[in-house]
């Protein structure tokens, strides 16, 4: 339990320098957004090619 609290408390040091951290945070958000868009595009491509197989596999695994 003490380790968990230590990890949470250690993460707050990044907020000390807002001028440098804001730019880095914005870059990270943009990179994550780009990676998410790429992943969603890949999922769309798979669904366009194999939508029927995807649905069949999903239902067999207990999806509704």
Swiss-Prot record:
Coiled coil: 24-52
One GO MF term: proteasome binding
Source taxon at top rank: Bacteria
UniProtKB keywords: Coiled coil, Isopeptide bond, Ubl conjugation pathway
Coiled coil in keyword set: yes
Signal peptide start-end: none
GO biological process: modification-dependent protein catabolic process; proteasomal protein catabolic process; protein pupylation
Short name of any one Pfam family annotated for the protein: Pup
Disulfide bonding pattern of the chain: none
Post-translational modification note: Is modified by deamidation of its C-terminal glutamine to glutamate by the deamidase Dop, a prerequisite to the subsequent pupylation process.
Residues the record lists as Deamidated glutamine modifications: 64
Recorded domain comment: The N-terminal unstructured half of Pup provides a signal required to initiate unfolding and degradation by the proteasome but is not needed for pupylation, while the C-terminal helical half of Pup interacts with ARC to target proteins to the proteasome.
Family, similarity comment: Belongs to the prokaryotic ubiquitin-like protein family.
The protein's assembly and partners: Strongly interacts with the proteasome-associated ATPase ARC through a hydrophobic interface; the interacting region of Pup lies in its C-terminal half. There is one Pup binding site per ARC hexamer ring.
Name used for this protein in its record: Prokaryotic ubiquitin-like protein Pup
Naturally occurring in which organism (per UniProt): Mycobacterium sp. (strain KMS)
């Amino acid at each position: 339990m003490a380790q968990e609290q230590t990890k949470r408390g250690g993460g707050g040091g990044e907020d000390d320098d807002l001028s440098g951290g804001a730019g880095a945070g914005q870059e990270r958000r943009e990179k994550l957004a780009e990676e998410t868009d790429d992943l969603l595009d890949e999922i769309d491509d798979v669904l366009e090619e194999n939508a029927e197989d995807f649905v069949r596999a999903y239902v067999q695994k207990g999806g509704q």
